[in-house]
């Protein structure tokens, strides 16, 4: 990576990481305030937990499109200011309705799509996958850190203080955007990172992609439903006051990451990727069942939580990588945009439905719902044949001697391991989907003037 790419990745990882850290901080504590906020019922608490997912799903594509017109940095600044405003409103709230409004504003500053677009502007194709992975890892780290620190901060500054802190974090990210994120004079639209409305229908008709979309929806639906019920389980089963919940989250999350890493490494071997996915979903089902039968059972609750976090951290890391290897070369941005939309919808559905179930049926209702949803997912994972995992290559046609594009397509298709060819003559780019076991970059040297980006 060159200096501009390293600077861009560091700055954008910090910006997105700070924002997501602020969103995740309240997950382990908000449900415990059901008796202290005016109008708060379990159902309304669930809506407050998940509301940011609904507005994020609605605004992520518009934010990306607006950044094409008005520039990346102005939209990043606008998104962070919306997040800070939502945090202030939630911090000053005395009723659950105002908390929900604040959470909605937090989610409406949907800068993730803008960050991806800016990464496309500032990184070369051969570095882009690594760049996206590094930015994604900052979100994963933010999630783990927030679950550990949320209960500790709650004990010190309370829920209002946490919301004030999240607003401050958003404002701290503003100087990073203004002074450290490299400037882009002419934002580009790249099909490998940005959505296109015309491709949405085609992506939704792809069964393999729809299967992954539904999977990420279930995963985040279960996550949010759990955080309606689990804090009360810690109170009642472990008889642990909320200012000591960190004593469970910290060791359980640490042990879960240690158990997850070997499985994630194993998944990097092509023939093991899909079996590891199936194992992760199976562990998630077992976790739901263990938590269901662990009423008043301290050991069962801790084991169930550990299994849940093993499964969640594994699937959260594995699924985006698997998704990127399944999507059509020219539709990667659209496919990942749809995938993220399903994820955010899962956040909202899980929070709202989990809260309603907890209010009517208690924790058992939440865990039964989660187990049924994951069981359906597991049946699909086992029943669906493992797909052939391909990789993307982007080819620069600027200096190609052959200008007959139909002839170029025929030449590309004649190379060993090439499964799909999409030419964009206006951009002098070709997208290839290749079998990495059969395709070798050196084979392009036979085509005059052709080189990988």
What are these regions (language model features)?
Residues 58-94:
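Conserved MFS/SLC helix-loop-helix module at the cytosolic interface between two early adjacent transmembrane helices
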Residues 60-71, 259-273, 358:
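Helix-to-loop junctions at the C-terminal end of transmembrane segments
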Residues 102-139:
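Cytoplasmic helix-loop-helix junction between adjacent transmembrane helices
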Residues 1-4, 182-213:
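Juxtamembrane intracellular "pre-TM" segments in multi-pass secondary transporters
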Residues 53-61, 143-144, 253-261, 347-348:
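Residue-level signature of mid-helix packing/kink "hotspots" within the transmembrane helices
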Residues 168-187, 377-385:
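C-terminal membrane-cytosol helix-exit motif in multi-pass small-molecule transporters
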Residues 28-42, 228-244:
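Short amphipathic helix-loop junctions that connect adjacent transmembrane helices
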């Amino acid at each position: 990576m060159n200096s501009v790419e390293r600077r861009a990745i560091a700055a954008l990882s910090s910006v997105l990481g700070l924002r997501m850290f602020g969103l995740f901080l309240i997950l382990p504590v908000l449900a415990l305030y059901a008796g202290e906020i005016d109008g708060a019922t379990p159902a309304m608490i669930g809506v407050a937990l998940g509301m940011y997912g609904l507005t994020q799903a609605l605004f992520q594509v518009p934010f990306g499109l607006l950044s094409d017109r008005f520039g990346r940095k102005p939209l990043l600044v606008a998104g962070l200011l919306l997040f800070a405003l939502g945090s202030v409103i939630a911090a000053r709230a005395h009723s659950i309705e105002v908390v929900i409004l604040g959470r909605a504003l937090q989610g409406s500053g949907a800068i993730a799509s803008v960050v991806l677009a800016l990464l496309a502007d500032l990184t070369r194709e051969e570095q882009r996958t690594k760049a996206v992975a590094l930015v994604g890892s900052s979100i994963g780290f933010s999630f783990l850190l927030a679950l550990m620190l949320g209960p500790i901060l709650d004990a010190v500054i309370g829920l209002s203080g946490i919301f004030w802190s999240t607003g401050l974090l958003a404002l701290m990210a503003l100087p990073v955007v203004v002074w450290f994120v490299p400037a882009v004079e002419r934002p580009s639209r790249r099909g490998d990172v940005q959505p296109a409305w015309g491709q949405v229908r085609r992506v939704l008709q792809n069964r393999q992609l729809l299967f992954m979309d539904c999977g990420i929806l279930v995963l985040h639906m279960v996550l949010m439903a759990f955080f309606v019920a689990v804090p009360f389980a810690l109170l009642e089963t472990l008889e642990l006051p909320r200012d000591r919940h960190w004593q469970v989250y910290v060791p359980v999350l640490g042990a879960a990451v240690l158990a997850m890493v070997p499985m994630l490494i194993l998944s990097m071997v092509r023939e093991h990727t899909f079996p590891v996915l199936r194992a992760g979903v199976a562990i998630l089902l077992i976790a739901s069942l263990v938590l269901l039968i662990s009423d008043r059972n301290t050991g069962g609750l801790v084991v169930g939580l550990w299994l849940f976090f093993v499964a969640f951290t594994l699937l959260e890391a594995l699924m985006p990588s698997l998704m990127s290897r399944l999507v059509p070369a020219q539709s990667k941005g659209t496919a990942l945009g749809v995938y993220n939309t399903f994820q955010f919808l899962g956040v909202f559905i899980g929070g709202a439905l989990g809260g309603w179930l907890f209010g009517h049926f208690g924790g058992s209702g939440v865990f039964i719902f989660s187990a049924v949803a994951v069981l359906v997912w597991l049946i699909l994972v086992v029943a669906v044949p493992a797909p052939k995992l391909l990789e993307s290559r982007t080819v620069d046609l600027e200096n190609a001697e052959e200008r007959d594009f139909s002839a170029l397509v025929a030449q590309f298709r004649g190379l060993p391991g090439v499964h799909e060819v999409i030419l964009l003559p206006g951009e002098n780019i070709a997208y290839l989907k290749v079998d990495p076991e059969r395709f070798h970059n050196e084979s392009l040297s036979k085509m005059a003037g052709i080189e990988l980006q």
